[in-house]
């Protein structure tokens, strides 16, 4: 991977801290707090409010970072949109190849995709909001803006490797804890983790990763029949 000579897109120290610390809050503490306060929440409602609260807090915390990178999007929209589209086609191809390998070993549907599809049937509006808008914003600020952005200041390879692994774990851990065979599905999320990091680094604009993530989620949900 060649170094990028564009001015680096970086958060402030407190923004790095907030974006990274929000990851365990989002995964573990906030859902339990919401269920304690609102025990009648549906699964779709729990996910919606977890992402909505995260989107609000992270946007407020990282507003300056988002605005600076939006200026970069505004200055060269065709380049950034083109890189997002390029990333999407690379993502489709790589996920297709990895899926062939995974399904050869474990010929059943990805449980995360199945869960999203079931929720979309029951609570379509909320799941559309989560999948297309809230999740890309929250996840890109946590993973690409926070984890990757901080670690690459010291070691790019570590930044790529750890961010890819955490992103894959984030989408699979709850299923893998019920059956260890589901750890294989980690492989399906590694290409996305890499390509989202690379798209962000190549353009030095977090909006490239956010837009790519939005596009991928939208098409994936449509393909799943959501």
Model-derived features: positions:
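Gram-positive cell-envelope targeting signals
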Residues: 1, 5-17, 26-27, 31-34, ...
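Interfacial transmembrane-helix boundary/kink motif in multi-pass membrane proteins
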Residues: 2-24, 43-51, 67-100, 152-158
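Alpha-helical transmembrane segments in multi-pass membrane proteins
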Residues: 14-67, 112-114, 126
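Alpha-helical transmembrane segments of multipass membrane proteins
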Residues: 22, 26-31, 54-59, 90-99, ...
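Membrane interface segments of multi-pass transport proteins and intramembrane proteases
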Residues: 35-45, 106-111, 148-161
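Juxtamembrane helix-loop-helix connectors linking adjacent transmembrane helices
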Residues: 39-43, 67-135, 178
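Internal transmembrane alpha-helix with an interfacial aromatic "cap," most often the third helix
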Residues: 63-71, 138-144
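Transmembrane helix-loop-helix hairpins at the membrane interface
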Residues: 96, 100, 104, 124-226
């Amino acid at each position: 991977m060649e170094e990028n000579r564009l001015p680096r897109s970086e958060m402030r120290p407190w923004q790095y801290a907030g974006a990274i610390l929000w990851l365990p809050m989002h995964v573990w503490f906030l859902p339990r707090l919401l269920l304690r306060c609102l025990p009648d929440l549906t699964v779709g409602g729990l996910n919606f409010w977890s992402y909505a609260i995260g989107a609000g807090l992270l946007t407020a915390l990282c507003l300056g970072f988002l605005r600076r990178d939006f200026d970069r999007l505004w200055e060269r929209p065709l380049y950034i949109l083109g890189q997002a589209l390029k990333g999407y086609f690379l993502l489709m191809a790589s996920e297709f190849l990895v899926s062939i390998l995974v399904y050869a070993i474990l010929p059943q549907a990805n449980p995360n995709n199945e869960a999203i599809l079931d929720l979309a049937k029951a609570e379509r509006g909320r799941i559309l909001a989560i999948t297309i808008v809230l999740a890309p914003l929250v996840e890109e600020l946590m993973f690409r803006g926070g984890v990757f952005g901080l670690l690459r200041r010291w070691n790019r390879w570590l930044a790529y490797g750890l961010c890819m692994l955490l992103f894959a774990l984030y989408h699979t851990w709850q299923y893998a804890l019920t059956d260890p065979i589901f750890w294989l599905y980690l492989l399906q999320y590694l290409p996305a983790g890499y390509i989202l990091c690379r798209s962000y680094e190549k353009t030095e604009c977090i909006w490239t990763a956010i837009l790519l993530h939005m596009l991928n989620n939208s098409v994936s949900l449509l393909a799943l029949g959501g």
